[in-house]
Amino acid sequence: GCHTNSKTKDYHCHKKKPPKTLGPQVKKENIKGVSFLDLKPESVSTNLMRLDYEGFTVWLDCSKRGAVKFQYNAQRDTGNFKRSNTFKLDPKVPEECQQLNGKTYGKNYDRGHLVPANHLDHSKSAIKMTNTMTNILPQAANMNRGAWLMTEEVTECYRDIDELLVVGGVIWGNDPSNDYFVKSHGVKTPDAFWKVIIRGVGSNERAIAWIVPNSAEATRKKTDDYIVSIEEIERVTGEVIPVAGFTKYDKSNPWVIPRGCNKG
């Protein structure tokens, strides 16, 4: 089963340990699918690949050629390895389960990270793995450098205060108007992304959650508009977020960036 370790605060599941390798271990795992923002049923396979990279995990839906969920622990920032400019496919993942190439998207869309490189900058190999295309999806440039970046900066600052559990995912939706990259990359463009950050334990547990639309309107100054309750995340995605009941039902106030936070 899955639980939070009372000493390390690490949320994990007991499974047979895979052999050590420089790349991820590919596992088949059944988890709940994702729903649309309007709660219409979405066609997401229940047979997902779990990819355990160094320091983070991604769940991949072969039918989408892309991820549906990600998770990692963000600990105190002790590193400064730089992000690579190279994006590559994962040789351990079947071709039919991932994008066609690692090239840029264009059309004002970035190669957007689910798990940001900066949060794995303690390890040269881990930060390199974040540029694997299984961790990348088309994100509107304004959103990737705006509201989504702001959620990453909140994580960056608060991980120096508490160890954080970060869980997030993809809301693929059903809007075909932005599916520019089906021919070039084999992947549709998600309609939104979600993220939950959890800190503290027991009565001190706190969490904040966002659903960020994948659009040019999702600028930095609108980040707080996208804060939702964890109950809403669970309702929209079908996920069960590992937080106490008292944390689920009210929207969090914004987590203010602490004065003097080093976002690098």
Where do the protein language model's features map onto the residues?
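Domain-level detector for secreted/extracellular nuclease and nuclease-toxin modules, and
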Residues: 23-264
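Post-signal/leader-peptide non-cytosolic segments of secretory proteins
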Residues: 2-25, 67
